[in-house]
């Protein structure tokens, strides 16, 4: 009996050992083998493009800045761009570093508008101006200055395709063979913001004398100007007429501003054109603009044919007539025309026709307007009754011996007050006049002025309109 119990116990133990051994073998089969794993379980490799140097925000991706490497596909961020052809020529939307992969969100087809082609900031993001936030159109994304090529067509296309946008022109020379035109339609107008050294120049092939470099509001003519949103501007830049072109015409309607620009070598600097004989048309604010004309007998600095314009802080030289007004109710402040004795303007008969302010309007307003060396400072047509406050006429040279401060074609019906005229040389043969009139009997007044009545000629009529003695 005992032998049977022992035999049964042994059999049970042997069965248990066999079962446990099979379980261990099964577990070992499910474990990774230990030791060298080469050639077993390798991950998929891919070729990917990445940066090999740090680059700035807004930089262009070029062949020299990238490299291709092989990496484990599983290690790449989702959406990583693999092919180098998909990144070349793109622009970065953020600063990137060597070894960094390209994601679609980090690239754009066009350069951000507040940086140049080197990734340098054009205007600092200081809360005042930010080209990117403003949505300006960066012109040099579409054309290049300084190439010697005509960019007229390219600029015109850009204007036509970007209504109600502001176009930014960086520094450089933009050669034009014909005028650039903009629309007067409020739905199509554009504004221009120019770097101070963005230089527009008439080419040698410019054929039509006195056509302007820019015609603002020249197409889609309209009489709409009351809308508060109907305003467009031109700011900055240099406009060079090459002694054959005008600089800027303003046409159509609307409220327009021209600021911080330099104009040179032009037949006419700025011409504001009327739509009708009553002077209706655009209303323009010109502020801090310098003009140097072509120095020819047909040269003008500014011509205002419309009403209600404002000219402020301007210096104008090398024109036979600096400013001509046929419109009325214009306000002129702190303007300084200067006559330059250079051929053909240095001819005595030509000089006698020179005028700083030529006024054919019914009434215009002058404040702190002064001129040097023109034969006539202010000329008024027959029906003009303008007002001059704190104005100044000065002659530093006795050349050609004709010095008239104010000349009226007809009667004098204006107001001159707190103004002065001075001959800064001692030539006794010079004919000087404070006021000349074509007809007596006007109702104008001269109040609190500075000039020497002993220096004026017998033709001077100022004594008939003085309400107090001049100071000298």
Regions found by a protein language model. Name each.
Residues 118-154, 472:
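Right-handed parallel beta-helix/beta-solenoid
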Residues 147, 164-173, 193-199, 225-227, ...:
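Extracellular beta-strand-rich, repetitive "passenger/adhesive" scaffolds
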Residues 156, 160, 164-210, 239:
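N-terminal extracellular ligand-recognition/capping segment immediately after the signal peptide
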Residues 184-193, 213-236, 250-260, 274-289, ...:
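Surface-exposed loop/turn motifs in large extracellular/passenger domains
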Residues 2-15, 22-119:
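Mature, extracytoplasmic segments of signal peptide-bearing proteins
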Residues 121, 449-472:
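Extracellular/surface-exposed low-complexity segments
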Residues 156-160, 221-229, 239-252, 268:
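Right-handed parallel beta-helix
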Residues 178-179, 201-211, 242-248, 266-273, ...:
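Short glycine/acidic-rich loop motifs that flank beta-strands on beta-rich extracellular proteins
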């Amino acid at each position: 009996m005992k032998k049977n119990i022992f035999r049964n116990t042994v059999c049970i133990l042997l069965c248990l050992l066999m079962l446990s051994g099979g379980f261990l073998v099964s577990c070992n089969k499910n474990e990774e083998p230990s030791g060298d794993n080469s050639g077993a379980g390798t991950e998929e490799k891919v070729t990917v493009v990445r940066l090999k140097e740090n680059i700035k925000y807004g930089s262009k991706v070029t062949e020299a800045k990238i490299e291709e490497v092989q990496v484990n596909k599983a290690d790449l961020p989702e959406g990583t761009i693999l092919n180098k052809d998909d990144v070349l020529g793109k622009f970065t939307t953020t600063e990137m570093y060597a070894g960094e992969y390209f994601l679609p969100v980090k690239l754009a087809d066009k350069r951000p508008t507040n940086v140049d082609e080197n990734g340098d900031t054009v205007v600092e993001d200081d809360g005042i101006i930010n080209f990117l936030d403003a949505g300006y159109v960066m012109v040099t994304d579409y054309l290049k200055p300084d190439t010697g090529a005509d960019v007229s067509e390219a600029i015109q296309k850009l204007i036509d395709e970007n209504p109600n946008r502001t176009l930014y022109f960086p520094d450089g020379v933009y050669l034009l063979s014909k005028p650039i035109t903009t629309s007067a339609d409020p739905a199509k107008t554009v504004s221009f913001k120019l770097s101070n050294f963005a230089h527009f120049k008439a080419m040698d092939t410019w054929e039509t004398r006195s056509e302007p470099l820019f015609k603002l509001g020249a197409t889609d003519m309209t009489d709409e100007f009351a809308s508060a949103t109907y305003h467009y501007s031109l700011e900055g830049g240099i406009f060079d007429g090459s002694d054959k072109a005008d600089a800027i015409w303003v046409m159509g309607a609307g409220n327009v501003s021209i600021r911080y620009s330099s104009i040179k070598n032009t037949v006419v600097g700025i011409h504001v054109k009327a739509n009708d004989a009553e002077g209706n048309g655009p209303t323009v604010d010109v502020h801090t603009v310098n003009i140097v004309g072509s120095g020819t007998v047909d040269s003008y600095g500014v011509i205002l044919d419309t009403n209600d314009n404002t000219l402020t802080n301007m210096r104008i030289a090398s024109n036979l007539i600096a400013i001509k007004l046929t419109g009325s109710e214009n306000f002129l402040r702190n303007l300084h025309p200067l006559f330059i004795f250079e051929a053909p303007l240095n001819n005595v008969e030509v000089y006698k026709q020179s005028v700083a302010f030529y006024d054919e309007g019914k009434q215009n307003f002058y404040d702190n307007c002064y001129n040097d060396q023109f034969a006539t400072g202010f000329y008024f047509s027959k029906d003009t009754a303008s007002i001059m406050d704190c104005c100044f006429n000065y002659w530093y040279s006795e050349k050609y011996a004709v010095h008239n401060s104010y000349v009226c074609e007809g009667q004098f019906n204006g107001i001159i007050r707190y103004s002065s005229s001075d001959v800064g040389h001692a030539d006794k043969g010079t004919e000087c006049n404070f006021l000349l009139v074509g007809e007596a009997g006007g109702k104008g007044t001269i109040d609190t002025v500075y000039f020497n009545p002993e220096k004026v000629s017998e033709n001077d009529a100022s004594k008939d309109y003085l309400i107090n003695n001049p100071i000298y």
